[in-house]
Amino acid sequence: MTMTRRSALGGLAALALPLPATAAVKGSDTLGGIAAARGIRFGSTLGLRNFEDPAYRALNARECALVVPETEMKWGATRPDARTFDFRAADRIVDWATRNGLGVRGHTLLWHSERWMPDWVKQHDFGSNPRAEAERLLTDHVRTVAGRYAPRVDSFDVVNEAIDSDTGLLRETALSKPIGAEAVIDIAFRTARDAAPRAQLVYNDYMGWRSDEAVHRTAVLKLLEALKKRGTPVDALGVQSHLGSKYSDSPTGLGSLDERAWRTFLDEVTGMGLDLLVTELDVHDNPLPGDIRRRDADVAAHTRAYLDLMLSYPQTKTVMCWGLGDRYSWLNGFRPRADGLPKRPLPFDAALRPKPMRDAIAAAFAAAPVRG
C-alpha cells in the first residue's frame, strides 16, 4: 500500500509479529544447515524481480536461514516523495520470510551516495533552514522504516557506501550538504538505535582484500574510529565481498591480493569491538577464461580462500550471497565479458543447479571454528 507517514506508523502494530523462536530447521546438507552447525547464519538477497519465480523462492527457503531484500527497503523503493511511504514490495518479502521461518536483514536505511538517491531528494526544497529540514527528512525516514520492520529484522545496514573508494573522502549528498556527512551518518545510526533498540546496526561497504584497495580500507577504519569516539551506536562492519568487481578488467585475473593487509584491517575492526558480516558475496568472473569447468573451479577456489580467511574470525557470524542463482545476478548487467559469455558469479547456475562455488561455501562453513 502507499501511505503517509501517519498511516505508516499506524501500521506498525499489525507488523509486530514475533520472530520465530528458532529459525526454520535446515537440512544438514543445505548451506543454511551446514553454517548453523558452526553457529553461522547463511542467507541471500531476494528481490521482487526474482521473487515471482517459485523455483527460486523454493531454493532460498531450502538453502537459507535468512534473506535480505535487494532493493525493496531502499529509499527509491519506499519513498516515492517526501510525504509518502510505500512498503508493498518490502512487506511481500518480509511476510514470505516470516511464514517460512527465515530471518530478515534490512538493507539499507541510508545509501549515502548522490547517485542512488531518489530524484526528489536531490531536487527537494530545503527552505530557509536547510539543516533542520535535512535532519527532519533523514530522521523521519530512518525512524519510520526501522520502526516498521524492527519486530522482524534483527540486523540493519544503517549506512551504505559513505566513502568514495578512490579518494577516501566521505561522499556528499543532498542531505549532507546542509549538515555535513559525519552528522548525517551519526543521525542515521542514533535514530536507528532509538527505533530498533535490539537490532544489530551495521556500516556496510565494499572495501576488499586487493592490494589496490588500501585507500578505501584506511578510510573505512578512520570512519569507524570516529564513530566509536563519538559514541555513535555502530555494532558491526558489513563487508560486501563483491570479489573481483571493482577492477575486474585487470589482466592479472581476480587481482593481486594482500592477505596481510586485509588481516591487519580486520584485526583493527574487530579490535574496536565490532562484529563482521559478509553481506553481498559474489565473484565477478570477467577476467577468467571462458571454459566453464575451469572458470567455475577458479571462482570456487577464490571463494574458499576468501571465506576461510573471513571465517577464521569468530566475529564473522553471518554470510550472505548477493543472490543464489546466476540467472538473477546484478553482475549480468555490469561490464559484459569480452567473449560475450554469461557470467557465473553465484553458487547455483542459471538453471538453479549447484556449482563448485556452492561446494566451496559448504566446505568453508564445515571447516570454520564453532561460534560460541
PLM features per residue range, with description:
Residues 67, 97, 156, 237, ...:
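Conserved, mostly hydrophobic/aromatic
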Residues 20-45:
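C-terminal segment of N-terminal export signals and the immediately downstream linker at the start
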Residues 68-71, 92-178, 182-208, 285:
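Substrate-binding cleft and catalytic face of glycoside hydrolase catalytic domains
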Residues 36-91, 96, 103, 110-123, ...:
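N-terminal substrate-binding region of glycoside hydrolase catalytic domains
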Residues 1-19:
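N-terminal secretory signal peptides and thylakoid transit peptides that target proteins
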Residues 49-61, 139-145, 215-226, 303-306:
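Short, acidic/polar
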Residues 182-187, 196, 200, 217, ...:
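Glycoside hydrolase catalytic-domain groove-lining segments
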Residues 148, 157, 162-178, 253-268, ...:
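Aromatic-rich peripheral "rim/lid" segments of glycoside hydrolase catalytic domains that contact
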